Every structure is written in structure tokens, then in C-alpha cells.
A protein has these predicted regions:
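Conserved PLP phosphate-binding loop immediately N-terminal to the Schiff-base lysine helix
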Residues: 111-125
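Active-site nucleophile and cofactor-binding loops and adjacent substrate-binding regions
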Residues: 87-90, 109-115, 135-138, 296-304
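ATP-binding/phosphotransfer module of carbohydrate and carboxylate kinases, centering on a glycine-rich
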Residues: 1-67, 77-81, 98-106, 123-130, ...
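Glycine-rich phosphate-binding loop of actin/hexokinase-like ATP-binding domains
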Residues: 128-187
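Short beta-strand segments
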Residues: 10, 69-73, 111, 135-141, ...
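Short hydrophobic alpha-helix segments
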Residues: 31-33, 86, 156
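A short acidic/small-residue loop/turn micro-motif
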Residues: 35-37, 90, 160-162
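A charged helix-plus-loop insertion that forms the helical arch/lid used to bind
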Residues: 81-93
Length: 320
């Protein structure tokens, strides 16, 4: 009998979300755990497996599940391992696909979280019908899933498309990956918070943000201040969008995509981030690309796109 469901798991730096998905792309049920709560990988896998088993039981047990797909930072599709992910609590090489298979007795496939989001957009979202596009995930870090001629670009080792760790500012901010000046230290949600702290420390402008503990400021705090008209908060988003737009202008030159689709928590800022990104992308692109590349917001709920994309892997799971 054909198995009617697949599982999608999205592992982020803050939350891990998982869901049961049917063949039409409907998420039947889902759950989540806090990623950062678990400093030890075996404890994390145990709790994640318990949560996944609960939603499997709700649809009649593992006999109804075709496979499990996982999207994770630095996830390697070829090996099923998470390798040296700077925004996760566990370091080194983690054979996550095998660990989950051992606990759940269901085959597991794993890929980069941005690749999973790209699959979700191509199958169910803003990239339907497109063959050449890039999905940019803006969350704890910056990820990118590149699709060329309808195929995800993995590279020879599974790690193609690490836009977040290309250099935005020479000798700039220290990144968790060990490099300095990486794009994600400026243009992720955590990058926005870092910019806010720097501005508050080095400038004297009045700002609603000065009422907060600088070490606890989040990108949402900056957004809340900006929508109230706070000049400093608006400048923070302008700076963030400038760096991101300049990077996109370079990125476009490699694959000439039809569209760049923005996905993740930071896009909740809407025009505050979208407008400066578009402006600086267009200003810095080669003339042959100008006004040809669509800049789109994800059409899928933030939690849904990555879960749906990861679940697509579950339908075509391979053994490691």
C-alpha cells in the first residue's frame, strides 16, 4: 500500500519545527522544540524524536510515513551530516540523518535549510513554474538555496551556496564560523541586533531603543521602534538592506536568476528591509541584469516553507 505522508523537519538556530505533510502539500499536524535548549546533541535528538513520534502516532503510526526530510544549517545532502554549523549549539560533524533513522526506524534525508526552503517555494510557493531562482533565508543567520535549470545546486561536496559566509565587510565583525565580516553578521536578525548595539554605543541620537538593555535588543525591538517612527531604528534597517542589496547584486552575476525570494523571520519587517534591499541591489548590478530580477517575499508561512521543502525530501529519501 502506498504510504500517504512524509515528515518535514526544519532545524533553525532558535527553533526546530516538524510536521506531517500529505502529497498535496497540506501540513496535517506539527510541533516544535527550542533548538538552543539542548547543549548536547544526543539529548536534542532524543527530544526531537519524541516530538516527531507523537505527530506520527496521530496519523496512524510509522507504517503511513514514506520518509523523513530534514533541513538544517550546514546540512550535507550527500552524507546526511550537519557539518560545523556556526549557529547551532553542537560543533563538529553530526550524523543526524542516521541518528534519527536509528531512533524512528524510518529513512531520513537531510539537506541545507535554505535548500529545503527553495524546494518548498518551487513546489508550493512563489517559485512555482520557475527554473532559475535563489531563496535567501534571513533568520539567525543568512542562508541561500540556488536553483539552476530546475535543479538545486549542491556543488561537488554538498555545500554550494553559502552566501551568508561571503565577505560583506573586509576585516569586519567576527562571525561564529571563524571568519570576519561575513554577510550574516550584518544582514541576519542577529546582525540587525548587533548593528543596533553598535549604533547605540557610538552615536548620541535619541532613540526608543535606549530604553532597552542593549545586550537584550532583538531585531523585533528594532522593528517595533522603526514603525513608531524612530529615526535610528530606520537607519539600522537602511544599513542592513544596503549591505544585503549589494551582496545580491554580486550573487546575481553567478546564476542570472529570474527571482530572488526572501524567506525567514527578518522579512516580517516588510518594506523597512525590502525597499533598501531593492534600491541597493539595482544600483550595484551590472546593467545587463538591472530591472530584470524579481525580488519577492515568500508566499508561504515562515514555518511552513521549510517544513514543506524538507518533506519533499522525505518522498524521495535515499539511504546513507
Amino acid at each position: 500500500m502506498e504510504k500517504p505522508y512524509a515528515i518535514g523537519i526544519d532545524i533553525g538556530g532558535t527553533n526546530s519545527v516538524f510536521g506531517v505533510v500529505d502529497k498535496r502539500g497540506h501540513i496535517i499536524n506539527q510541533g516544535s522544540i527550542k533548538t538552543g535548549t539542548y547543549k548536547e546533541i544526543n539529548e536534542y535528538v532524543a527530544h526531537l524524536s519524541e516530538g516527531v513520534q507523537e505527530i506520527i502516532d496521530q496519523v496512524g503510526g510509522s507504517g503511513n510515513i514514506k520518509g523523513i526530510g530534514v533541513g538544517a544549517p550546514n546540512g550535507n545532502y550527500f552524507t546526511g551530516c550537519i557539518e560545523f554549523a556556526p549557529n547551532l549549539p553542537w560543533k563538529g560533524v553530526i550524523p543526524l540523518a542516521q541518528m534519527l533513522t536509528d531512533r524512528l526506524n524510518i529513512p531520513v534525508a537531510l539537506t541545507n535549510d535554505a535548500n529545503a526552503a527553495a524546494i518548498g517555494e518551487m513546489t508550493y510557493g512563489a517559485a512555482r513554474g520557475m527554473k532559475d531562482f535563489i531563496v535567501i533565508t534571513l533568520g539567525t543567520g543568512v542562508g541561500s538555496g540556488i536553483v539552476v535549470n530546475g535543479q538545486l545546486v549542491y556543488g561537488h561536496d554538498g555545500f554550494a551556496g553559502e552566501l551568508g559566509h561571503t565577505t560583506a565587510i573586509r576585516e569586519g565583525r567576527q562571525c561564529g564560523c571563524g571568519k570576519k565580516g561575513c554577510l550574516e553578521t550584518y544582514s541576519s536578525a542577529t546582525g540587525v541586533a548587533r548593528t543596533a548595539r553598535e549604533y547605540l554605543e557610538t552615536r548620541k541620537d535619541p532613540s526608543l531603543l535606549r530604553e532597552l538593555n542593549p545586550q537584550e535588543i532583538t531585531s523585533k525591538d528594532v522593528y517595533d521602534a522603526a514603525v513608531k517612527g524612530d529615526k535610528l531604528a530606520k537607519e539600522i534597517f537602511e544599513y542592513t538592506g544596503q549591505i544585503l542589496g549589494e551582496s545580491f547584486a554580486d550573487f546575481v552575476a553567478f546564476s542570472s536568476p529570474e527571482a530572488i525570494i526572501l524567506f525567514g523571520g527578518l522579512i516580517k519587517a516588510g518594506k523597512l528591509i525590502f525597499d533598501p534591499v531593492r534600491k541597493h541591489m539595482e544600483e550595484n548590478m551590472l546593467p545587463i541584469y538591472r530591472n530584470k530580477i524579481k525580488l519577492l517575499m515568500s508566499e508561504l508561512k515562515e514555518s511552513d516553507a521549510a517544513v514543506l521543502g524538507a518533506s519533499a525530501l522525505g518522498w524521495e529519501v535515499k539511504d546513507y
